Amino acid sequence: MTYQQFLTEIQLQIHSLFDTDVTIQLHKIQKNNGVTLDGLTILQKGCNISPTIYLNDYYKEYQAGKSIHNIILHIREIYQAYRPSSSVDVAFFTNFENVRHRILFKLIHYQKNEELLKEIPHFRYLDFAVVFYCLLSSSSQGNATILIRSTHLSYWNVSADALYSYALENTPAQLPADFEPLMPLLNKLMPMPFPADSMEEESETPLYVLTNKARLYGASCILYPNLLDSIANKLTCDFYLIPSSIHEFLILPILPGTCIQDLNAMIHEVNSTQVEEEEILSDHAYFYSRSEKLLTSMSEERTII
C-alpha cells in the first residue's frame, strides 16, 4: 500500500467508526524547519476545534508490520483522550486587548525557516529567529497555540516591536525558567532511576537543563532578562549551551580541553538520529561569557585550554 493509499484508507476507516455528525479531514500541516506533516482532524458537530493526529509515523508502523486495524484503534484512543468538550470562541482573537496577555515568544532556526519567516513577524538573534504565538490553553492533555502572522498585526494595527515587548513580559511570567542538573531531572521523568555509577560519572562532567516549567518551547529561556548571567554566577564560570531541541538547552560548564569541533559533531549526530526534524533548533553549540555577559555562536573549531 502506497502512502497516499494509506492516508485514504485511514480516513475511510476512521469515518466508519463515527456517525454522520462528525467531519473527518486530512490536512497538510506546515511545521518547524520546513517539515510538512499529514494531519487528521475529527470535528464533532457544533465544535470548531479538534486535536490534530499526525499520520506520518503511523505509516512507518504499518510498513514495520502493524495492522491497519490496530492503527485505527490507537488513533481512536488518542482522539477520545484529547477531544475537546466545547468550542473555542475565536472571535476574541480579532481584538488585541483580548490577546496581548497571551502573546509569547519561541526560538526557531533562522535559515531552516526562511520561507515561513516571510509570513510572520520575527527578530533575528544570532542564527535564531524569535517568533511569536498566542497560547490559548495549556494542560496535561496538551497545548493549544496560534502562530502570530503578519496578517494578524495588520488587523490588530500593532507593530512587531510592541509584540516583542508584550512577549518579553508575558513569557517569563507564564512559562518560568527551570534550571536544574540533568541526572536528577531524568530520574524524576524516568520510571526507573539511573544507577549510582551513572550519577558519579555525571558529577565529573556536570550537565544542566535549561527549559521552562511547561517544557514548551523552553529554549527561548535564553531571552529572559538576566537569566544567563544568573546561571553563570551560580556556576561561577563561563558555559556552553547545547541546543537539545526547540524545548530546551543543555548547559555545560567550561572544562579544560573541551573541543568545539567534537561538541558540534556530537550535536549534529544527536540531531540526525534522536531529534525529530521539526524540533531541531541548531547544529552547533553556543558560548556564554560571564565577564562579558555575552552569548556567541560557536560554529567553528576551537579548544578551551
Residue ranges and their predicted role:
Residues 1-32, 38-40:
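N-terminal alpha-helical "arm" segments
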Residues 2-10, 67, 71, 159, ...:
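Short amphipathic alpha-helical segments
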Residues 8, 202-217:
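Short low-complexity stretches enriched in small and charged residues
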Residues 10-18, 75, 79, 167, ...:
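Hydrophobic, Leu/Ile/Phe/Ala-enriched alpha-helical segments that form helix-helix packing faces
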Residues 18, 22, 83, 87, ...:
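Residue-level signal for secondary-structure boundary elements
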Residues 22, 112-116, 213-221:
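Short charge-dense sequence patches
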Residues 27-209:
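Charged, alpha-helical interface segments at or near domain boundaries
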Residues 213-305:
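C-terminal structured domains
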